[in-house]
Curated annotation (Swiss-Prot):
Organism: Saccharomyces cerevisiae (strain ATCC 204508 / S288c)
Keywords, comma-separated and alphabetical: Cytoplasm, GTP-binding, Nucleotide-binding, Phosphoprotein
Residues the record lists as binding GTP: 70-77, 116-120, 250-253
UniProt name for this protein: Ribosome-interacting GTPase 2
Subcellular location field: Cytoplasm
Length: 368
């Protein structure tokens, strides 16, 4: 029996099994097996070297990467053409984009790479179409922009979320608060900081570890709301990606005002119409907000700060991160920094490598 057949058999057994107290451990074991087989399927495909095709991979560049994911002909290519400095082939039929097309969104002094991926197809997690290559690129994103057709949004969103979930991409989720360490000896030790309120029991943890052939490990569950699914994610951590997702509903000109209002009120959501140029600026502003970037202006001694060419860093970055962004060896030569702005207690403040900088701070760096 091949891996795809095994996956199908487990999914069918899970569908047949009633969810209750008596079956929750059995279902948890099936979920663990399913996660293992899906990962094996993706690893086999990646190792086979097939399917990528010319131009599929795009080198990561700029201050952040955003990937556009959606079904064919939902308006991804149109959106890319409207907000970036590139052109993606556009047509009114499915599968126009056959390779990943990059563009650059210049906003607030930052250069944000936007990648229009081939239209993802239902069944990517079982090896259908080019979905596997699409999700492999999505794993490298700082933000997923899920573009949906407002006239078909409910079905599209649910199926895309399921596909991404199946291949280990977790949208708008935090890593489970579980400490897990594989050991050489000592057996399995499980500790809960408070009694679990879910199906994640000590027995379930030990059953799943046994199925993964892990006989020595330390597990500390710090959150009483963690589930079996969360624990499976923890032991498969190297194959899990926790990515922010912004849901963009296109073609709002084709639905009622009531429906537009309902969609717009959902969290992490923007509504727009590419054809009518409605809501495009809202999309750009929300991308900037979700990426949570900070601009830092540099200043040389005796010279005014450079305000038209900021260094862009992740929010909550330190002076050390800033130095590394300039050059990886710069930290070794670093002496001190002078900081003006909201992160400084007084202006200027003399700071070391661990000082956290805020958006629009001005920084002077001094070397030894």
């Amino acid at each position: 029996m091949g891996i795809i057949d095994k996956i199908k058999a487990i999914e069918e057994e899970m569908a047949r099994t009633q969810k209750n107290k008596a079956t929750e451990h059995h279902l948890g074991l099936l979920k663990g097996k399913l996660a293992r087989y899906r990962q094996q399927l993706l690893a086999d495909e990646a190792g086979s070297g097939g399917g990528g095709g010319s131009g599929f991979e795009v080198a990561k560049s700029g201050d952040a990467r955003v990937v556009l994911i959606g079904y064919p002909s939902v308006g991804k290519s149109s959106l890319l053409g409207k907000i970036t400095t590139t052109k993606s082939e556009i047509a009114h039929y499915a599968f126009t984009t056959l390779t990943s097309v990059p563009g650059v969104l210049k906003y607030q002094g930052a250069e944000i790479q936007i990648v229009d991926l081939p239209g993802i197809i239902y069944g990517a997690s079982q090896g259908k179409g080019r979905g596997r290559q699409v999700v492999a690129t999505a794993r490298t994103a700082d933000l997923v922009l899920m573009v949906l057709d407002a006239t078909k949004s409910e079905h599209q969103r649910a199926s895309l979320e399921k596909e991404l979930e199946n291949v280990g991409i977790r949208l708008n989720k935090e890593k489970p608060n579980i400490y897990y360490k594989k050991k050489e000896t000592g057996g399995v030790k499980v500790t809960f900081t408070s009694p679990p309120k879910t199906n994640l029991t000590e027995q379930a943890i030990k059953m799943i570890l046994r199925d993964y052939r892990i006989h020595n490990a330390e597990v500390l569950v710090r959150d009483d709301q963690c589930t079996i699914d969360d624990f499976i994610d923890v032991i498969n951590e190297q194959h899990r990606n926790y990515v922010k997702c912004l849901y963009v509903y296109n073609k709002i000109d084709a639905v009622s005002l009531e429906e537009v209002d309902k969609l717009a009120r959902e969290p992490n959501t923007v509504v727009m119409s590419c054809e009518m140029d409605l809501g495009l600026q809202d999309v750009v502003e929300e991308i900037w907000y979700q990426l949570n970037l900070s601009r830092v202006y540099t200043k040389k001694r005796g010279v005014r700060p450079v305000f038209d060419d900021p260094l862009v860093v992740r929010n909550n970055s330190t002076i050390g991160d800033l130095c590394h962004g300039i050059h990886r060896d710069f930290k070794d030569k670093f002496k001190y920094a002078l900081v003006w702005g909201s992160s400084a207690k007084h202006s200027p403040q003399k700071c070391g490598l661990n000082h956290r900088i805020d958006d629009e701070d001005v920084v002077s760096l001094f070397a030894k």
